[in-house]
C-alpha cells in the first residue's frame, strides 16, 4: 500500500469519529515552530496585529518579564483597535496560586487589564474540574492534584497555535515543547475560538472587585455548569458533520478546484465528565498504523495506562515503536522540594516497569516467521533546559516521511486520560513539505537523547544499563508510584 492509500484509508477511519477540517497546508501556512523563543515571537506578533479576536486558553499565565510583555501587547492592541475582543481561560486552581518568585498570581497580573478595558472588551474565565471544585477553599495546589484544565490553544483572528506550552517565562525561553502554527485557517480557528468560549462559559467569569484594595482577587458571576450540560456542549463541538465519508475528495471543501492535501481533526478529552473523545480517536490512529510502519511518541511525563500500552504494542508490530521522554536532569519536576521531590523518581520507576509490560504485550504477537520489533525509550537531556514536548508521529514505513501527527496538550498518561481536560489535533497530510517538517520536528527533539539511559526493552545489555542509571531512584518511589500513579 502506497502513501496515498494510507492517507485515504486513515481518512476513512477518522472521518466518522471527529469533525474534519480540510485545507491546503501551504496556503494555510501550517508549520511547526521549533523552539520556545520562536513560539513567543510568533504569538506576540500575532497579538500585535490582531483586528478582531484574541482567544487564549492555558493552564496558567506566568508572572515574569516575558509574560508581562505579552500582557502589555494585549493591552496595546485593545487600546489602539476598538474592534478587538479578548477572551482568556485558565485553570481555576492554578490561576489563583501565587508565584514563589513574584508573589502574585495569574489573576493578580490580569486584574488591572480587566479594570482598564472592562468586561465588554476582555473576558476572563476560570475552568475547574469537578474534583477541583470540591477542593475550593483549600490551598490551590490540592485542587491541581485532583485535576486541572490542561488545554492550550491560542487563537488570534484566523491564526492558531496549538501546543502543550503554557504562557510562562520558561516556556518562552528554555522549556522545550511542541507548537503547530496555522497562519491562515479561518475554519479551524473558528472551531478553537468556539471551544475556548464554551469552556469559559462552563467555568466562572472573573469580575472587577467593587473595592480597589479588596482582599479578594476576584468574584464570580457564573454558576457551576452541571456536568451533563458541560459534556453535551463539548460533544456538540467534536461531533462529525459528515459521517459517511468515502474518498478523501468527498469531504466538504470551499475550493472545488483542487482537493485538500491535509485534514485536521480536533479532539477533546475530559475523563471526569465522561468525555473520552481523544481516547477514541487515538485508538483509531494507532489501529491505522501499517504492520511495518512506525510509531514515535513524545511525552514529558511517561505514565501510560495499560490499555494504551497494549495499543502501542499492537501498532506497527514489525516496525518501529519509539518513546521520547524526559531525562531526570531535564525533568520538569527536577529540584522540587518535600514530597514533590519524589515525582521524578516515580516517573523513572514507571519507565522501568513499562519495558517488561510492553515486551509481554508484544510477545503475544510473535509468529514463526516474524518477531515483533522492540520498544525503544529515549531520554531527552539538555543542559539548562527542561523537556515538555508531547505528540505522535506516524509513518507508513521507515522509508517515507510522517503522514500523520498528533499535537496538543495531552501527555498520553493516566492523568491526561482520566483527570485533566485536554485538547489535541490529528493532522493527516499528503503535502510533502509538511511531512518533512514533521520529520524535522522529531529529529530536532531526538538529537538530545542521552544514550546512556536510553534502551530497547528487548536488549538485555542496554536494559541493564538503563536499570543501573536508575539506581539512585529512592526505594519509596515504587510505593508512591503505585499509590499516586493515577495522579501523575
Q: Which stretches of residues belong to each language-model region?
A:
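Alpha-helical membrane-targeting segments
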Residues: 3-19, 130-146, 464-488
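HKD-type phospholipase D/PLD-like phosphodiesterase module
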Residues: 10-49, 63-291, 328-399, 415-417, ...
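Short catalytic-loop micro-motif centered on adjacent basic/acidic residues
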Residues: 55-57, 294-299, 378
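A cross-family glycoside hydrolase active-site/sugar-binding cleft signature
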Residues: 57-59, 89-91, 298, 324-326
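Hydrophobic/aromatic residues located in beta-strands of well-ordered beta-sheets
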Residues: 86-88, 321-323, 405
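Long, C-terminal catalytic modules of enzymes
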Residues: 165, 356-488
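Terminal interaction modules at protein C-ends
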Residues: 193, 220, 224-250, 255, ...
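Short, solvent-exposed amphipathic alpha-helical segments in soluble enzyme
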Residues: 311-315, 422
